[in-house]
Amino acid sequence: MNNPGTSGTISVIVPVYNVEEYLPRCLESILGQTYRDLQVILVDDGSTDGSSRLCAEFAERDPRIECIRTSNSGVSAARNRGLEAAKGRWIGFVDADDYIEAGFYETLVTHLTHSDKQIVCCGVRAEDTEGNRIERFKGRRFPAVEQDFDRDDALLRYLNPDTRILYWAVWNKLYSAELLKGIAFENEKVIAEDFDFTLRCFLRSNGLRYIPDELYHYLVRPGSAITGSRFSKNSFDGMFFMDRAVREIQRAGIGGEVIKCALIGREITAAKTLRDYQRGNREAEGPENAEADLARCRETLSSGREAMRAPLARRNGGSAWSAVTLKSKVLCFIAAHCEKLLRFI
């Protein structure tokens, strides 16, 4: 049952690709939401296992489900297809191997309707396939209480990978549909596409409401995109998006700590990209033919130095959102001065 004072459909976009083992749990958690006014859009991205059958079976059970079948084009294209079909007042995303608490959407929409913000974001519990908690962000000081961030505050807490406390993904957030008009995922990129989409939402928004409750369960499984280690041409996607982030922030006329954090984030991303390249395990047709991308990473480190000038991030205390860990300072220094040593760190 929906809370009094909250009304309107939430469009939930679920990209589906070969997740037969996990899809039933995901869909049961969505259909079991205490907030009932849902449009559940399943975008089957050309699955070759039993996922298509499961989508059809669940659609027969519940009229709130709409199934869209596409040829395999990747998660970004699938999400964009879902955005085209969305009719709700609010829009959310769930990955098909994840699941959500029963009060996930009721909690988020209640916060949106009682706030002037256009985005609400909740805490995340990362888990392995056995349900055990995985600590993905040790040392991060995530807010322990509900908190509103204006646009620039949200950007500060999002851009620097060493001090990021706002999760980059789209799936632990609920967005005003009005905010998302004209914003789409980058179809040709497969890494950090969530980061780019969320950043552009932040830039357009008036900020967000953060609630610490861990209402979203994020599955980290062997072989998933986030855990893959092979270096390919797609490994430059993060650098592409950090370059775009700097340009978009400059275009918006935002300076001060925000642009400093963006520049620092770009340098750290360049150093990590060069490190992963030097470690090898490359696809033959990929980065060996990407000298321009490698040169862009090197140029960023040689012309920047914001990361080296930034204060050290402290595990317990400190409010310098442009701070950088000692590990990242060393990484940036070695990448700039003796790149081949990166394979050993």
PLM features per residue range, with description:
Residues 29, 36, 44-53, 71-73, ...:
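A conserved acidic beta->alpha catalytic loop
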Residues 278-345:
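Membrane-interface aromatic/basic loop that binds lipid-linked glycans or pyrophosphate carriers
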Residues 8-11, 29, 39, 196:
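Cell-envelope/extracellular polymer assembly enzymes that use nucleotide-activated donors
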Residues 24, 38, 49-57, 99, ...:
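Acidic helix N-cap motif at the loop->helix transition within catalytic regions
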Residues 18-32:
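Short, well-formed alpha-helical segments that are part of the catalytic scaffolds
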Residues 91:
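Short aromatic/hydrophobic "clamp" motif used to bind/position activated sugar donors
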Residues 70-86, 99:
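Glycine-rich, basic loop-to-helix element that forms the pyrophosphate-binding segment
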Residues 99-208, 218-233:
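Donor-binding/catalytic cores of nucleotide-activated saccharide
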